[in-house]
Amino acid sequence: FEKKISSYQDSKYGIGVGNCTDAITISLKALGVTSDSEVITTSNTAVPTVTGIVNAGASVRFVDVNEYSLIDVNKIEKAINKKTKAIIPVHLYGQMCEMDKIMELASKYNLKVIEDCAQSHGATYKGKKAGSIGDVGCFSFYPTKIFGAYGDGGFITTNNLELYDKIRRIRFLGMEKKKMSSGHWNGKYYAIEHGTNSRLDNLQASFGNIMIKKIKLWNKRQLNIANYYSK
């Protein structure tokens, strides 16, 4: 299931977690965000975005939205200070933020970018899928989302192998398997850093394997409905 979702979102790696709130928290921790850090996000978002930041120990700095109800990139730079460590653009209702400008700011100020993709499965920005542009993308599989499972579920995408390994450890109590000198796995797990217990359960993954076959149809139907209202 992880391979299917990451492939669909045009990302090299994918990690299933308990929910999107955990996905944001784990991603921030993996990216080095600490208690003395500030994270910029939009004020027009659901509580879980902010909860994910606070759970990582960081402070939130809100930026207002543009005419499309997405984070105003022209106001992000004014909010950046010496404590700023990351930006969380929130893609809403299948519409993506101006990611090229956000990535330019991130590069200029050496900031991390965590895409909140809870409402944008399959969305694209200039030919690039949601969750494939920033350092990580965080998704929700809650039943009311564009792509819902049977219950709670979350997902993290990234194109960075080192970051993938760290996220995978953090979501499983900081543990990983060790290899013996022969190169074979010794079957034991070692806790090498602090982590949490936030794995995507098999039921949600199994349900997701079925539902992913329908996501293109759902997105097409929603676009047709949106076009109808636009008229």
Could you tell me what each predicted segment is?
Residues K3, D10, N44, F172, ...:
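Solvent-exposed alpha-helix faces
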Residues K3, D100-M103, D152:
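Active-site phosphate/pyrophosphate- and oxyanion-stabilizing loops and adjacent acidic/basic residues
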Residues S120-K126, I133-K231:
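Active-site region of PLP-dependent enzymes
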Residues K29-C117, T124:
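PLP-dependent aminotransferase-like
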Residues F1-E38, G52-N55, F62, K128:
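Phosphate-binding glycine-rich loop
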Residues Y8, V33, N81, A130-G131, ...:
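Alpha-helix termination/capping residues and helix-transition junctions
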